[in-house]
């Protein structure tokens, strides 16, 4: 816990306003350990905690024989503020059976998101494409997200990115998709998901210039400036930036940079010449 606390204080010292907690499915760590972690953070290092994707909630539910509603309630009571959209991949069971057979199924993933929304928690939602799905199945994924949002209005943002096949043993045979496909996917997502207020650009996977172009294809959020990231980088994809560079790219695209919180309330905005304090989130606001 203390090591995590040190990382949080480093984040706050740089102007950070939230942390993301995600991990593997470790059967040897008791559920109470996660609850104590949340309590520890809120007591000693208060910050917005965005954590525990539907896949992890499903794992907790199965491993500890708890209803998913109870898992979410316990996590929220301990200090969890919002839930990330990790593990969404493609929300079509045929694809998941091939690409991620041990993760929560498509229906279960959506069910857990709906339970979280009904519990008063906001979440993000994702789509990782290029894992063997058809174009029709990508659209089915988007439609299922749109349908759930119509019922709950609980999604704050949608983020899409392509599979990074390098160093991903089970998917290393898949071809890497190009920038054109990414920008088309962003544009189609913006049209279909007219009830999801924000689309986040994935410069982490696509690089800064393509990330900037995505602002013209439907994204209004340039994403976060991350202090530490271990998932995409493990797949041998590494792009680094600074707040000044994010600021400049947003201005050059014709937008005004702003710092935001997880719920998209604006902390501060400026003319793009500089950001007063180092920010971990940069949003392009029209």
Predicted regions and their residues:
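Conserved Radical SAM active-site core
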Residues: 1-140, 144-148
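Auxiliary Fe-S-binding modules of radical SAM enzymes
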Residues: 12, 143, 149-286
């Amino acid at each position: 816990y203390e090591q995590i606390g040190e990382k949080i204080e480093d984040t706050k010292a740089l102007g950070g306003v939230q942390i993301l907690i995600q991990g593997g499915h470790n059967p040897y760590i008791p559920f109470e350990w996660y609850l104590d972690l949340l309590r520890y953070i809120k007591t000693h290092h208060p910050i917005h905690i965005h954590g525990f994707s539907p896949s992890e909630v499903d794992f907790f539910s199965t491993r500890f024989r708890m209803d998913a509603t109870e898992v979410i309630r316990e996590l929220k009571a301990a200090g969890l503020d919002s839930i990330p959209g990790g593990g969404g991949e493609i929300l079509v069971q045929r694809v998941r059976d091939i690409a991620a057979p041990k993760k929560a199924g498509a229906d279960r993933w959506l069910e857990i998101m709906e339970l979280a929304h009904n519990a008063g928690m906001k979440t993000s939602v994702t789509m990782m494409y290029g894992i063997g799905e058809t174009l029709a199945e990508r659209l089915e994924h988007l439609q299922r997200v749109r349908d759930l949002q119509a019922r709950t209005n609980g999604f704050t943002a949608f983020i899409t990115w392509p599979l990074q096949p390098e160093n991903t043993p089970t998917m290393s045979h898949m071809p890497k998709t190009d920038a054109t496909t990414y920008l088309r996917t962003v544009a189609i997502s913006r049209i279909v998901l007219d009830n999801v207020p924000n689309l986040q650009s994935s410069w982490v996977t696509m690089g800064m210039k393509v990330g900037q172009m995505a602002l013209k294809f439907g994204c209004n959020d340039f994403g976060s400036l991350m202090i530490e990231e271990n998932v995409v980088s493990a797949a041998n994809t590494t792009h680094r930036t600074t707040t000044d560079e994010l600021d400049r790219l947003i201005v050059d695209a014709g937008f005004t940079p702003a710092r935001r919180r997880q719920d998209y309330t604006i902390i501060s905005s400026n003319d793009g010449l500089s950001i007063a304090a180092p920010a971990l989130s940069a949003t392009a606001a029209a």
